[in-house]
Amino acid sequence: MKIPHVTDPVSNMVGGMAQVVRASTHAATGAVNTMQMLASPVAEFAWPVVQSVAKSTGRALGTGHSPNFANRVDPPVRWHNGQRVHLDLDPLLPFPRWHEYAAVVEEPVRRIPGVAKGHVEGSLGRLVIELDKNADSDVVLGKVRDVVIALAADLALTGARSAPKVAPFADPGNPLAILMPLTAAVMDLVALSAAVTGWVTRLPAVPQTIRAAAALVNHQPRMVSLLESRLGRVGTDIALSITTAAASGLTQAVGTPLLDLACRGLQLSEAAAHQRVWRDREPQLASPKRPQAPVVPVISSAGEKSHAAGHNWTAAASNEASHLVVGGSIDAAIDTAKGSMKGPVESYVDSAANGSLIAAASALLAGGGTEDAAGAILAGVPRAAHMGQQAFAATLGRGLANAGQLVLDPGALRRLDQVKVVVIDGAALRGDHRAVLLARGNTPGWDDDRVYEVTDALLHGERAPEPDPDESPATGARLRWVPLQGPSATPVQGREHADLVVNGECVGGVDVGWEVDPYAIPLLQTAHRTGARVVLRHVAGTEDLSASVGATHPPGTPLLKLVRELRTDRGPVLLITAVHRDFASTDTLAALAIADVGVALDDPHAATPWTADIITGTDLAAAVRILSALPVARSASESSVHLAQGGTTLAGLLLITASAGSKSASPITLRRWFSPVNAAAATALVTGVVSASKVLRLPDPTPQPLTAWHALDPEIVYSRLAGVTQPLAVEPGTPDWRRRLDDLSYTRALSPLRKPVTKLARLASATRQEFADPLTPILAVGAAASAIVGSNIDALLVAGVMTVNAITGGVQRLRAEAAAAELFAEQDQLVRRVVVPAVATTRRRLEAAQHATRTVTVSAKSLRAGDVIDLAAPEVVPADARVLVAEDLEVDESLLTGESLPVDKRVDPVAINDADRASMLFEGSAIVAGHARAIVVATGVGTAAHRAISAVADVEVSAGVQARLRELTSKVLPLTLAGGAAVTGLALLRRASLRQAVADGVAIAVAAVPEGLPLVATLSQLAAAQRLTAKGALVRSPRTIEALGRVDTICFDKTGTLTENRLRVVCAVPNTRMPHDPLPDITDPHSAAVLRDAARASTQPHDGQGHTHATDEAILTAASSLNSHTDSTWSLIAEVPFESSRGYAAAIGITGNGKAPMLMLKGAPEKILPRCRFADPEADVAHAESLVRHLAEQGLRVLAVAQCSWGHDTTDDNDTDADAVDAAAHDLELVGYIGLADTARPSSRPLIEALVTAGRNVVLITGDHPITARAIAQQLGLRSDARVVNGTELIGLDEDACAELAADVQVFARVSPEQKVQIVAALQRCGQVTAMVGDGANDAAAIRMADVGIGVSGRGSSAARGAADIVLTDDDLGVLLDALVEGRSMWAGVRDAVTILVGGNVGEVVFTIIGTVFGAGRAPVGTRQLLLVNLLTDMFPALSIAVTSQYEEPGEDEYQTDEEADEARRTHQHEVLTGPTPSLDAPLMRQIVNRGVVTAAGATTAWAIGRWTPGTERRTATMGLTALVTTQLAQTLLTRRHSPLVVATALGSAGVLIGIIQTPVISQFFGCTPLGPIAWSGVITATAGATAVSVLAPQWLNKAFGIAQLNQE
């Protein structure tokens, strides 16, 4: 089939292209001829596009036809695939609100024979036609055109004329998207061919001035903007491609076209993938069955600036700039507001453009020619920055397209690195099913829970569950929807109201919204990890997600206004939203239009979101991947900028040295084939591709449904889960090459090498991670610069230091991982899975699951949602599960909730807002009593325990001291570079050669870079980690030790961390005790009697099994401690174990005095007291309740103990059942009360008191009741007036509000795992360096979030230990104080080492500058001499200081008692922790300046003595060099004279120096000469004098150089 008017287009195409060519350079003539040859084969494919481009270009150049003859212009074909055609209506209907006449156009078109379907897409301005399969397209489209033209003529007579409309989006179906990169790639091939041919045939190359002129135009943003205003984007791209290719070919430069060819190839593959997705999704997106979005005219700021009239119609608000097509061509554009903000690449491009112009001007002013100026321009080309960004975006775009995502605007992927705010619209979080948000019963038999479960069943099309005995049947139930009135009726809120009607009677009301999408949790977790501010616009049902975001806005907030304000206040915005039938679409589409990156989910039943940049599928999985690309895009762009900066620096240095060196270089030079700029660009391109590939290889997020299983009837839960079990989660597939290599490694020949090769591979991987150190790029550039100027030894030194540092760090990482693996090794958990027989109905299947006796033992890892598991004490729950059967079931959830007491579980549904969720079992909890059957609802990362951990799974690990050193380097590096520049400038003033001057300057600059900093940081942390490990603290992440030295807030989990998670009897209180009397000791006779009776009522262990309940164990243990033997006076007859429904345990027995049998009861006071008799009921009951309340306020769990005579027959204890006991348990005699509490660790209170005394803020976080939490806090040493906040107070708070609350709170009670993360994050936002100490799975996420995560070993959860940076391996929490002291010590060591490294280098720079000024124009020390100085003064002395402890612990005295030794240790810890906070700021700068001044003074004095005494210049330089070393070594000795290692290192370095200086051959190699007695006397005098000044007059030095004297640490 053919599309009309696509034949013979060559002449028109060439004419349009010629207009563009005339606007560019004449040097592109060859490329134009190439385009003419290519025109014919691509014409049929590209003609509709090229025709529009030609018209646009003609208007831009002042030629072409007037646009005001729409009734004589055929509507152009914008896209076709043979059967579906898009006709552009813009030229035909040039008046506003034309979309209101869509029906007038559609009806006549549909009646044309051969047209199967036809409709107008108003947002696109297109007539979309689907042809019959057998229709002749030429004939049909001809008739369509005739009909449309006639209709347009009629409508034009009545419509108000205005400027034409344009398409509001970048058309992925546009063939130009492929034609443009294809054309540019062909031009690059031609340029490559020309360059290689010219070099092979030795044709003369034109001056590089031509290439520089092309680069200047191509990389000057202002020039590009000017061309775009005249030629349009397409014309500008063509013109620049031609000029660049022609210039590269004529100058025989291979690198530029080769790199551009690679980049164009990526763009071509991206465009092809986008077009493929467009072809697949267009029938569904542009379907006539979908509702049309409202079209609103807007004023575009870009249209006002363009020469041709340009208007924009889109779903937006008046006066809002949106997408624009300049001049009506297919330039496709981007909203000008979107392009107005700059990311790292755009900012650098601007500065590089200005810098290259300044460099070129400087070259001309310095007497250089045009070639030198051209070289300066080419050295400043930011090619690497562009390449990295384009490579990342193109690779990511192709991957998204391959996954089926439609990218309407590829420019959005280029803006990912700019995003500062992520706005998530609650409409995008809407699931597929309706959900009950609130249920209210108003009739007997219809409580809230019953209304909820019946309504939920109706919404899901299920049969309502059978009623309980006290509930009414739901026969004939239906929902009657009630329209909302007033402001709450805003559709965007997503809330509707309905009445539940049964047999015509309204029995309750419900608020109905939508379920939350299963990918909502992964989406919010990923957004949290992007580093951008996350904002959530709520819809009904998303309120529980507030804690995961930075700010929230209520339902009904205008999305357009919100996005606009955030863009203005905080920067570029990425918006994730969706258009739904019951949501306001105009506001959503408008917000998508102005968002910098608009991502919209596609709802096939709603309007197509054409204003989005990216249209995903119907779920959030693709949006999760896009969000995960944000930090990677930012990192890739920053890396590209750094590469560009390094390439420019090296290219400029190469330019200077080459111009000063030989001119006889071969045509194949680094400058032409492999220049630093091109090398950096190639590296950036590869890095961009690799970074994007990592994003695309990320596994798909795991759905985490938030269904309220606890509120549903078991039958409903079983029907939704059973029979539809999900497949097991599998790891991402292993690549074929990796699998083949793995198979090959098991062969007989290679199997012996498998283990060592694996170790080497792991070491290589760990070493590669260490190369990510922030100082690595700086040192790499320095090494390359040294090599360029001929200082190969310095280059090798720097490279060697980098390698040694990375290997050392890698080894430590592997050691830590191995130790952690050994510590955390676990056995595979086994669980009994119930085999459910196949039966007909859901109810019968549920009954079979509840009563089936056959089970199979399987691995917990193989469980899936829908499996039924069987559990009994003391097993651990392997997954989240809904209880189906509960027999006296009690569960220990302390590792999850922090609640130290067991909780009762039951089968009945609980209220949807009930935080206890008593019908659920959660992974990690332990069964302490009873038996359970439960159906699995979530496994793996979908469980509640793992959900909190995964929320911070990828939180950036503390950068350690490296980050602080990077800040220091950023301050010092400019000074060292300035020193190198000063040496070069002074040398030139003294008429030194350019090459020599530059070499001296580079040598100084490189030598002044503290290349030992990374190694110092690594080894100091390693040494501190080893010292801590010896004290019982395993350091898994050495980088966090630096944060230990700065910690000012420590958060403690209570249960299992500060306590042993084991109940003990605190007191036994007789009933006669007054409420406020001091608690008696259990050894008191009256208290012992109460404890004895409580023990008699406790269930005794049987058959060697453990105690059934933790309370029984605690009471029996306490009772046995008072009696060395069993209570022989009590003969047990029968017992009734505790059951939650009864609330007490009972026992029947006979005492030794032969009295009648007694019934002993022990249970909750609210169950026991009503059964007791009192002489004065009113007063006695008030007294009892007051006493119970007083005990509870002490943080105790209170049990009441009572007794009475048993008057029944006891000959057959089988007849003594629970019902008989319950009937007899009246008129009881109240004996007293038992108070139980969790057992505190012996080291807890001393630790808390020491931390508080040292000025640390201690925060207690627990799942206990607020009253219990307050009491425990006081017992542990916190203030009695400490504020206690309930976890419910945190619900709904955004990040800012939570930070404000957390600033002055010391105790948090009843908190969930997610809220623990919220608390830690809030403290961090308050500027506090936070540590988190915990032992449970509920602590793991907070441990990972904290600056320092500390796990407590022992009974604790492996999840907590696995998330921790430091693991305490024994029960002594006092090791934490040692860790804090070690952190301080490491900081002090690093500070002194940095003083040696940086301060010594500063002194070297100052000495070199002085020597250059007063010498012969050359630096007094050369490259090799500076190498010697760095080796002797920087590396080994600095390392010895870094690995030794600053604070000496008090020595052991054989005459000291243990108490005296502990007191001395505590005093030492207090002195260290109460000192000033370690800092690398003012105190360090003072020490650096002092050392630099003293070093320079000593070296300069010795050098001056050498000049004033007879001798050669080499002797003088040697004296200065020697004093330079000895002055620094003397200061090092003074810093740590108590350390044998430092003393030995300093003396050893001095000995090596003397040996090198005095050995003739070696001395000459280093540019020195042996010194005589007079020279040595001068050196010693200078060294001693300078050192004496630093010791005797430090304050004078501070004042002389403007450094404020601060308190010494």
Swiss-Prot record:
EC top class named in words: translocase
GO terms for MF: ATP binding; ATP hydrolysis activity; metal ion binding; P-type calcium transporter activity
Reaction(s) the record says it catalyses: ATP + H2O = ADP + phosphate + H(+)
Domain of life: Bacteria
Main location: membrane
Transmembrane segments: 30-50, 176-196, 238-258, 357-377, 641-661, 673-693, 778-798, 921-941, 969-989, 997-1017, 1396-1416, 1426-1446, 1542-1562, 1573-1593
GO annotations of cellular component type: intracellular membrane-bounded organelle; plasma membrane
PROSITE patterns tied to this protein: ATPASE_E1_E2
InterPro entries: ATPase_P-typ_cation-transptr_C, ATPase_P-typ_cyto_dom_N, ATPase_P-typ_P_site, ATPase_P-typ_TM_dom_sf, ATPase_P-typ_transduc_dom_A_sf, HAD-like_sf, HAD_sf, P_typ_ATPase
Keywords from the UniProt entry: ATP-binding, Cell membrane, Magnesium, Membrane, Metal-binding, Nucleotide-binding, Phosphoprotein, Translocase, Transmembrane, Transmembrane helix
Biased composition (Acidic residues): 1449-1462
Subcellular location: Cell membrane
Chain positions recorded as Mg(2+) binding sites: D1335, D1339
Topological type in the membrane: Multi-pass membrane protein
Assigned EC number: 7.2.2.-
Keyword presence, Heme: no
Record: active site: D1053
Residue ranges of the region described as Disordered: 1447-1476
Coiled coil: none
Cited PANTHER family: CATION TRANSPORTING ATPASE, CATION-TRANSPORTING ATPASE I-RELATED
Family: Belongs to the cation transport ATPase (P-type) (TC 3.A.3) family.
Name of the protein described by the UniProt record: Probable cation-transporting ATPase I
Source organism: Mycobacterium leprae (strain TN)
